[in-house]
């Protein structure tokens, strides 16, 4: 640790009494609908962000009212598996006790509830506890919800990998009893709090972990601080290749921030998984930047000390030496929409959920549809990192009923294009306080325009990975797209191109801070060139690199911000 002044977040964590703060006082305060001072940040460690409806913010200011404070709550669902019973409990709460009545499936395989008023916060935590769930560590400077490839076909390997995702999640959770005391009204335990892995100040910044089963890269391993690539022998999981230091967030105008691909460390057998996970987290805990949060993520620690030095420290702390990497390859990221049969003889139905938003609308009552399926389904639900949902483990005798319900509620759409399936957006307006431009709300129309251009140039059956994020923080994973938009201001975006379908290359800035008409003009020119000059089977991202329309990002810390 240097002599530089620590960021204020470090003070509030250290002084929080292991994440308790004075949250209870704010809950009892009838004069405000929100949390103030340090508690505004501390509730994140309990799985919540304070938000307000930005569509009506100015109107409320004019009326001399405080913003309409609510919280967004994330459930902890390692690997995205949830039972129908649990789903129905969350569905009912969203319908009856949130301002928006929706459920948002995230690209980290969990659900968010937006618009929870302060009086309903304790009840929702108690509901989750009753359902066998919680929201611990789904936000804040801790290890977040652990991802796992939602592979519905390789069911044996998936089950084994998911079990490890669950073990990693549990092992790295905060040990403090604050969550139970504050939200579940549990009595304070006399035994002193201790955080043997995370420490009293927790981590320098958020930490993301994923388990991935090749050839699927649906979890986007290069968006994660720590990734475990499943290595199987037949249908048996034997170990993991370990990757470190991925991450996509950056700060506009700050060239010391950048997206970064993860570094391969080596192979470990299963028995060493938790020891390696703990050693990686504790090394980042001790070596990460606590003075400047912009440079506090693990990717910057690796760049500052060197990947080899970081790796050696992980080996020293864990007592485990990495073996050479086992071969693996990624060939796809998207979900297989529709029915597939698993090797266990069960059927699995993947349903496309636009932007992960479940909300009954005229002609598309998709939230009610999932609830109807949950009432009759005997398997489980699996949320995907592409914001979709898998009705998993359907017996052959039940397949027709599930299929009929999906069609009745508009959840199976034969006209769904490849481009729409390959597109994603973060939430952005109206609830995200960091949003600079629209994302989720404009995605349907933007994709329709792209579909029109693809058909115009004779490639209507083709697609490219397309993502919009309302700010540079990376939630929409635009920095692993073939075409990515990052919001700069209302109606203005920066256009990045040159990623690939596999999610193993970072795109480069092509046009900065352009308005929407200019954006579509540029995309049209690129689609026209791709349609005319591409090689057989050549993806859009690979084409713009080969055609030298844009130069590839080879080493992001060095060349991401280079003008080429």
Swiss-Prot record:
Pathway: Sulfur metabolism; hydrogen sulfide biosynthesis; hydrogen sulfide from sulfite (NADPH route): step 1/1. GO terms for cellular component: sulfite reductase complex (NADPH). Siroheme binds at residue 475. InterPro entries: CysI (IPR011786), NiRdtase/SiRdtase_haem-b_fer (IPR005117), Nit/Sulf_reduc_fer-like_dom_sf (IPR036136), NO2/SO3_Rdtase_4Fe4S_dom (IPR006067), NO2/SO3_Rdtase_4Fe4S_prot (IPR045169), NO2/SO3_Rdtase_4Fe4S_sf (IPR045854), NO2/SO3_Rdtase_FeS/sirohaem_BS (IPR006066). Binds 1 siroheme per subunit. It comes from the Bacteria. Its EC number is 1.8.1.2. It is an enzyme of class 1 (oxidoreductase). This is Sulfite reductase [NADPH] hemoprotein beta-component 1.
């Amino acid at each position: 640790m240097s002599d530089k002044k620590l960021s204020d977040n470090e003070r509030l964590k250290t002084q929080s009494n292991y994440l308790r703060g004075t949250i209870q006082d704010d809950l009892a305060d009838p004069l405000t609908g929100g949390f103030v001072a340090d508690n505004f940040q501390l509730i994140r460690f309990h799985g919540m962000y304070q938000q307000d409806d930005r569509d009506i913010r100015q109107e409320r200011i004019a009326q001399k009212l405080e913003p309409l404070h609510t919280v967004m709550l994330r459930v902890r669902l390692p690997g995205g598996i949830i039972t129908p019973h649990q789903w129905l409990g969350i569905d009912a709460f969203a319908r009856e006790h949130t301002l928006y009545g929706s459920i948002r499936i995230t690209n980290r395989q969990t659900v968010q509830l937006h618009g929870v008023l302060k009086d309903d916060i304790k009840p929702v935590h108690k509901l989750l506890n009753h359902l066998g769930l919680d929201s611990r560590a789904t936000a804040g400077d801790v290890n977040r919800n652990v991802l796992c490839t939602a592979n519905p076909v390789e069911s044996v390997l998936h089950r084994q990998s998911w079990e490890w995702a669950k073990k990693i999640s549990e092992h790295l959770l905060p040990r403090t009893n604050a969550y139970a005391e504050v939200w579940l009204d549990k009595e304070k335990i006399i035994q002193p709090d201790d955080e043997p892995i995370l420490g009293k100040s927790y981590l320098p910044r958020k930490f993301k972990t994923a388990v991935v089963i090749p050839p699927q890269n649906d979890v986007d391993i290069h968006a994660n601080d720590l990734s475990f690539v499943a290595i199987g022998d037949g249908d048996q999981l034997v170990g993991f290749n370990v990757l470190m230091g991925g991450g996509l967030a950056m700060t506009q105008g700050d060239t010391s921030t950048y997206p970064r691909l993860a570094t391969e460390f080596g192979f470990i057998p299963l028995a060493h998984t938790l020891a390696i996970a703990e050693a990686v987290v504790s090394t980042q805990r001790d070596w990460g930047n606590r003075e400047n949060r912009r440079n506090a993520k693990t990717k910057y620690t690796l760049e500052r000390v060197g990947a080899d030095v970081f790796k050696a420290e992980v080996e020293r702390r864990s007592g485990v030496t990495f073996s050479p990497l086992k071969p693996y390859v990624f060939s796809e990221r998207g979900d297989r929409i529709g029915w597939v049969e698993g090797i266990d003889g069960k059927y699995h139905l993947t349903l496309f959920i636009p932007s992960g938003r479940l909300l009954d609308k005229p002609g598309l009552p998709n939230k009610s549809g999932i609830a109807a399926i949950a009432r009759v389904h005997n398997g489980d639900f699996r949320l995907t990192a592409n914001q979709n949902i898998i009705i998993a483990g359907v017996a052959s005798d039940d397949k027709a009923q599930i299929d009929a319900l999906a069609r009745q509620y508009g959840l199976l759409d034969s006209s769904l294009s490849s481009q729409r399936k390959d597109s994603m957006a973060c939430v952005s307006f109206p609830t995200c306080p960091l949003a600079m431009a629209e994302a989720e709300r404009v995605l349907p129309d933007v994709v329709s325009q792209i579909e029109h251009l693809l058909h115009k140039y004779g490639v209507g059956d083709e697609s490219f990975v397309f993502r919009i994020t309302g700010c540079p923080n990376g939630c929409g994973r635009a920095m692993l797209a073939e075409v990515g938009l990052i919001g700069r201001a209302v109606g203005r975006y920066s256009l990045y191109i040159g990623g690939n379908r596999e999610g193993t290359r970072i795109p480069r800035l092509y046009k900065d801070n352009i308005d929407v008409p200019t954006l579509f003009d540029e995309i049209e020119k690129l689609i026209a060139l791709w349609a005319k000059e591409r090689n057989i089977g050549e993806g859009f991202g690979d084409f713009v690199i080969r055609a030298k329309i844009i130069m590839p990002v080879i080493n992001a810390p060095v060349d991401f911000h280079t003008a080429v």
